[in-house]
Amino acid sequence: FMDFGMSFTQEGQFFSQFLGARTSNSLNDMFELGILPKIKGLYRRDYAKHMDFDGTEDTEIDAVLLTHAHVDHCAYLPYLREDIPIYCSEESKLILQNFDETSSSQYLTAKQRFQIYENKKGTMSKATGDKVAIPRRVEIFESGKEFSIDSINVEPLPVDHSIPGVHAFILHTSDSTIG
């Protein structure tokens, strides 16, 4: 899977700067509007179990290769299932970390929603903060140094772009090379 970003044109048909998807139902909104594909095993379990998925299905997605941290390439990573590894450059990871620290985004740590627990008073409370934080698996690659994801060898090549840490990938399989 390569990148998981938003299409400005597609989102612009339905949303604006001050009108976005509903916070508590955003994944369903994205499905209904045709913005995100409905693929079982791709999305966060805490979201998926409130959709047509049960959230426990196996995933066929081995990883996400992130070319860089512009939103048209990474905006939908917060919807990604937390156990699917994200492969990126150190620079891209730092940019994603900055997004997490300066906004309500959840690029590197998924904070589970819809989690309830019995508090000390014996009543039900909504779990928040570190109680519901699940760190995502982020794998840092070195520029120009080949690495493997299952049977695919990935060759990350640096690309000049408007932010640091941008890479193109050449994928080497037993049958062919893509890139």
Each PLM stretch: what is its role?
Residues F1-L65, E90-S92, Q97-K126, D130-K131:
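Pre-active-site segment of Zn-dependent metallo-hydrolases
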Residues A63-H73, H161:
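Histidine-centered divalent metal-coordination motifs
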Residues P135-R137:
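Eukaryote-biased recognition of long, low-complexity, charge-rich segments
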Residues Q10-E11, C74-Y76, I95-N98, E155-L157, ...:
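Short helix/loop capping segments that flank catalytic or ligand/cofactor-binding pockets
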Residues E139-G179:
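Catalytic core of the metallo-beta-lactamase
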Residues F1-D3, F31, C88, N153-P156, ...:
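Short hydrophobic-aromatic micro-motifs
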Residues Y79-R81:
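Short, conserved loop/helix-junction motifs that constitute active-site signature segments
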